[in-house]
């Protein structure tokens, strides 16, 4: 294909949208946008307005009601009816989007709308529905990284999207050959929320032309916004559903409304089944002929989790049942179309209250069953089915049962539910970036071949548990974990789970960790959890303790660490606290390794969990479920889920991946070999050297295009290094990869310097640079051990009596500061340099370095505020008040800001506002740690 400019791509899209049924209109500025909105509003409400279009005052009143709202509030207004008082005191209800009859909305498209707020901006393609800009399309020419379009959207949203542009629901970005969509939000836009569109078979629809044909047809787009965008009430965000979620819901709705048959949805673990099942439940509960939608879960811990998730998507949508009598009441309450309960409670309700549920012998009911492969489902399903004669059953699972991994009674998922309505496999999810792939290691803990409990070649009399839990082996495994944990978890940036074969094994490992932990400079935070049996078998006297006693000790250790007060009488609360702890991964206050037998291996999602240690036998669905705890997408510093097996589960892993990805090619799911990544590194390193042969030559680059080439080349190199570090054989030496760590740190310093320069220029100047929208992927560069706390620890160790040693300490700190990659540390770099150069030499052994540094920072902060206030002729105390508010709220108080700036010309006012906001944000970060 010949070279195609961005302008040509935009024009081609405008022509295509016109052919699809959009009215092409010319709107160049905000006034024309408002005029067009007003005209359409009057046309759509002609009957309600009784031939009297909105007057200027009435329209202004309306704008006052709908303008200046958050994106979240604007999304709610869009889907609601708004009462407007007319000049004659009558009231009329206005609507902005027909969410049921999608094709009855008015569809328009325009391009090159110009706005000027703090910065000038011109938007590529704007789709208007009923006059409101609901979809914004940003384009880049072919060959440009699509992430640049994403970063441009982020910049525009921060600087320019005001007024009616607050009603944008969705962004579409494309470079012609790659296209993504994502929802608008008040919070930070995340790359992980950019989605591909696909067909029903999960084949990507990438080109802009085919994307527009499939996704942007007027009725389809209105349907997507109306039905398949979710207003998350808890987090106050907008969520766009992914294509496979949409297709699954459509297939399930069709099966439920057009047939009497059952079905199941196979969507891989971590792909968002809860949202899919909620949307299906919600739509079905609105059907007149369906009397009740009952969402069944199998376990108590998942019950509360599902309820919490459902209520996020529609506040108050779920009435959780606490006991069977309440469940019976809710089943008979016609005002409750949707109920979430457990299958155990449902079975009990039928057994004890069948006469109260007579109506459901004939009424149409839909059951939606989460994780429908659960072992208890089979028997209880038969009982429920006997009572609900006119019911349909729809299952959701990430790991269905097939003949090779059928349930205990020999049945498969298809035997219970019938046809599979939609599939989205683990290979699809990894390909789309919705979950991560796996890096799997197999550590042989025996000198000879690895032992397997089911190995028929072993003499039957051998006590395999005795072999697996031999003191020497347990210590070997524990030491391997301790020695490698920081590498696997990026210096404890992430947490891990260690799954073992039995409660006895768990106790033994916990005690070994506890003993070895005492010798570590930085001890690991270890926790253990299991369910004890009140009347426990003592295994013929082999184990001289009751497991409850050991759990009590683990809980006591946990209480000391986290200042809690749990016991074996409050194990549910202990479980919930651990769950929140592992999910949040709060820095310096989190669990590093959670030891379990089976708990937390299914139905538990944590983005900050990246490593699973395995010392037990796993197969098929159990293996995939366990591995999948590690593969939730977080940020660039988490490129895969790390699995460390202390048993030879290679065959089991390959078999499970073959079954659940429906392919023999597992390369798309598992990381490639070390040699492949090493070759990739060599190629990237050569490319970097061709652009800038040495790190210091980056300083000589004048041309922005050349600087951009350097950024892109080093960014690729850094990504490969991140993957290489996951391999035990990796050594950061010239002999191994042709580059040593020092050279990498030097290149990284230059890379971060370019990032800081671009960030500063963006904040201070109304200037557009080609580097503004480059994705620097800063999170990938961070080494969390080298931060402000790390430097402060070195400062505390400075020998104030031995001047020669003091100079060595100072030089060490300077070297570290030169290569700082922690954002806050880079902000403090000059402060710390000045402190060690000017203050430290004057201190003696009686001085408190911590206090001296606090005093030094306080003086510098005071001077910085005084200087900024004097330079801009603003009140210093008012500036400090704004800064203090920002420190606690994260928001610059607009009322205080307006008062402080005073009466300035509009352009000057914007400049002053921007400068103050930047100053407050930077000084808060600089002096806030």
UniProtKB/Swiss-Prot annotation:
Any GO BP: DNA restriction-modification system
Other facts noted in the record for this chain: Type I restriction and modification enzymes are complex, multifunctional systems which require ATP, S-adenosyl methionine and magnesium as cofactors and, in addition to their endonucleolytic and methylase activities, are potent DNA-dependent ATPases.
Catalytically driven reaction(s): Endonucleolytic cleavage of DNA to give random double-stranded fragments with terminal 5'-phosphates, ATP is simultaneously hydrolyzed
Functional summary from the UniProt entry: The restriction (R) subunit of a type I restriction enzyme that recognizes an undetermined sequence and cleaves a random distance away. Subunit R is required for both nuclease and ATPase activities, but not for modification. After locating a non-methylated recognition site, the enzyme complex serves as a molecular motor that translocates DNA in an ATP-dependent manner until a collision occurs that triggers cleavage.
EC code(s) of this entry: 3.1.21.3
Organism: Staphylococcus aureus (strain MSSA476)
Complex formation: The type I restriction/modification system is composed of three polypeptides R, M and S.
Top-level taxon of the source organism: Bacteria
Listed name of the protein: Type I restriction enzyme SauMSSORF170P endonuclease subunit
Lineage: Bacteria, Bacillati, Bacillota, Bacilli, Bacillales
Name of encoding gene: hsdR
Residues where ATP binds: 268-274
Family: Belongs to the HsdR family.
EC supergroup of this enzyme: hydrolase
Molecular function in Gene Ontology: ATP binding; DNA binding; type I site-specific deoxyribonuclease activity
A Pfam family the protein falls into: T1R_D3-like
Keywords noted in UniProt: ATP-binding, DNA-binding, Endonuclease, Hydrolase, Nuclease, Nucleotide-binding, Restriction system
Helicase ATP-binding domain ranges (all copies): 254-418
InterPro entries, A to Z: Helicase_ATP-bd (IPR014001), HsdR_RecA-like_helicase_dom_2 (IPR055180), P-loop_NTPase (IPR027417), Restrct_endonuc_type1_HsdR_N (IPR007409), Restrct_endonuc_typeI_HsdR (IPR004473), SWI2_SNF2 (IPR040980), Type-I_R_enzyme_R_subunit (IPR051268), TypeI_RM_Rsu_C (IPR022625)
């Amino acid at each position: 294909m010949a070279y195609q400019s961005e302008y040509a791509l935009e024009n081609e899209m405008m022509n295509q949208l016109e052919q699809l049924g959009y009215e092409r209109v010319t709107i160049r500025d905000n006034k024309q946008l408002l005029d067009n909105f007003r005209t359409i509003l009057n046309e759509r409400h002609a009957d309600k307005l009784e031939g009297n279009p909105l007057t200027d005052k009435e329209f202004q009143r309306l704008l006052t009601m709908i303008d200046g709202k958050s994106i979240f509030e604007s999304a709610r207004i869009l889907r609601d009816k708004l009462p407007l008082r007319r000049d004659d005191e009558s009231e009329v209800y206005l609507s902005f989007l027909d969410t049921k009859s999608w094709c009855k909305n008015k569809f328009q498209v325009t391009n090159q709308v110009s706005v000027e707020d703090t910065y000038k901006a011109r938007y590529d393609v704007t789709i208007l529905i009923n006059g409101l800009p609901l979809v914004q399309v940003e384009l880049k020419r072919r060959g440009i990284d699509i992430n640049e379009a994403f970063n441009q959207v982020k910049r525009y949203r921060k600087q320019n999207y005001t007024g009616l542009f607050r009603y944008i629901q969705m962004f579409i970005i494309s470079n012609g050959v790659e296209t993504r969509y994502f929802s608008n939000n008040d919070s930070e836009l995340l790359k992980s929320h950019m989605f591909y569109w696909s067909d029903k078979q999960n084949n990507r629809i990438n080109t802009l032309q085919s994307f527009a044909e499939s996704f942007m047809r007027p009725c389809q787009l209105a349907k997507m916004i109306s039905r398949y965008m979710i207003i998350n009430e808890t987090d106050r965000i907008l969520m766009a559903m992914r294509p496979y979620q949409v297709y699954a819901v459509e297939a399930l709705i069709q099966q439920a409304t057009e047939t009497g048959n059952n079905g199941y949805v196979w969507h891989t673990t971590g792909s968002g089944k809860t949202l899919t099942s909620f949307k299906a439940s919600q739509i079905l509960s609105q059907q007149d002929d369906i009397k009740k939608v009952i969402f069944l879960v199998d376990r108590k811990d998942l019950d509360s989790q599902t309820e919490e998730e459902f209520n996020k998507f529609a506040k108050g949508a779920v009435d959780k049942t606490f006991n069977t009598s309440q469940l019976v009441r809710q089943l008979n309450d016609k005002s409750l179309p949707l109920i979430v309960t457990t299958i155990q409670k449902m079975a009990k309700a039928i057994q004890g209250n069948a006469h109260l549920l007579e109506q459901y012998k004939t009424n149409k009911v839909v059951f939606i069953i989460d994780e429908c492969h659960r072992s208890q489902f089979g028997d209880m399903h038969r009982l429920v089915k006997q009572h609900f004669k006119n019911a349909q059953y729809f299952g959701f699972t990430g790991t269905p049962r097939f003949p090779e991994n059928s349930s205990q009674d020999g049945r498969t998922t298809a035997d219970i539910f019938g046809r599979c309505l939609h599939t989205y496999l683990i290979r699809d999810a990894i390909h789309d970036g919705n979950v991560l792939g796996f890096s799997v290691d197999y550590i042989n803990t025996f000198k000879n071949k690895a032992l397997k409990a089911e190995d028929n070649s072993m003499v039957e009399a051998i006590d395999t548990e005795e072999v697996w839990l031999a003191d020497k082996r347990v210590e070997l495994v524990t030491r391997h974990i301790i020695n490698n944990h920081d590498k696997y978890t990026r210096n404890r940036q992430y947490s891990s789970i260690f799954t073992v074969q039995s409660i006895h094994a768990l106790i033994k490992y916990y005690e070994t960790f506890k003993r070895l932990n005492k010798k570590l400079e930085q001890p690991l935070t270890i926790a253990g959890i299991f369910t004890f049996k009140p009347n426990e078998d003592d295994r013929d006297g082999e184990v001289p303790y009751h497991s409850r006693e050991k759990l009590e000790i683990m809980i006591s250790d946990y209480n000391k660490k986290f200042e809690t007060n749990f016991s074996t009488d409050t194990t549910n609360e202990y479980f919930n606290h651990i769950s929140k702890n592992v999910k949040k991964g709060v820095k310096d206050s989190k669990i590093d390794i959670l030891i379990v037998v089976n708990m937390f291996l299914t139905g538990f999602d944590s983005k900050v969990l990246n490593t699973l240690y395995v010392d037990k036998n796993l197969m098929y669905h159990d293996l995939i479920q366990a591995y999948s705890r590690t593969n939730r997408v977080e940020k660039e510093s988490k490129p895969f889920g790390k699995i460390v097996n202390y048993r030879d589960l290679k065959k089991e892993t390959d078999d499970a991946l073959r079954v659940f990805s429906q392919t023999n090619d597992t390369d798309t799911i598992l990381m490639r070999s070390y040699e492949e990544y090493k070759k990739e590194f060599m190629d990237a390193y050569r490319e970097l050297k061709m652009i800038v042969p040495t790190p210091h030559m980056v300083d000589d680059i004048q041309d922005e295009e050349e600087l951009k080439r350097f950024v892109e080349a080093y960014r690729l190199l850094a990504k490969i290094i991140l993957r290489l570090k996951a391999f035990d054989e990796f050594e950061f030496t010239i002999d191994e990869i042709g580059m040593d760590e020092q050279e990498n740190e030097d290149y990284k310093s230059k890379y971060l310097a370019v990032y800081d320069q671009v960030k500063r220029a963006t904040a201070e100047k109304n200037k557009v640079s080609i580097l503004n929208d480059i994705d620097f992927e800063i999170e990938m560069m961070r080494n969390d051990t080298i931060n402000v706390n790390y430097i402060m620890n070195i400062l505390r160790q400075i020998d104030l009596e031995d001047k020669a040693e003091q100079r060595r300490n100072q030089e060490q700190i300077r070297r570290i500061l030169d290569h700082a990659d922690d954002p806050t540390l880079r902000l403090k770099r000059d402060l710390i340099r000045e402190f060690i150069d000017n203050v430290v030499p004057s201190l003696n052994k009686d001085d408190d370095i911590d206090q001296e540094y606090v005093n030094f920072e306080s003086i510098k902060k005071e001077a910085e505020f005084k200087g900024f206030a004097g330079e801009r002729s603003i009140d210093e105390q008012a500036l400090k008040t704004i800064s203090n508010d920002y420190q606690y709220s994260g928001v610059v108080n607009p009322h205080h800001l307006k008062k402080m700036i005073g009466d300035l010309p509009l352009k000057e006012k914007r400049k002053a506002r921007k400068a103050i906001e930047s100053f407050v944000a930077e000084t808060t970060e600089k002096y806030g740690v």
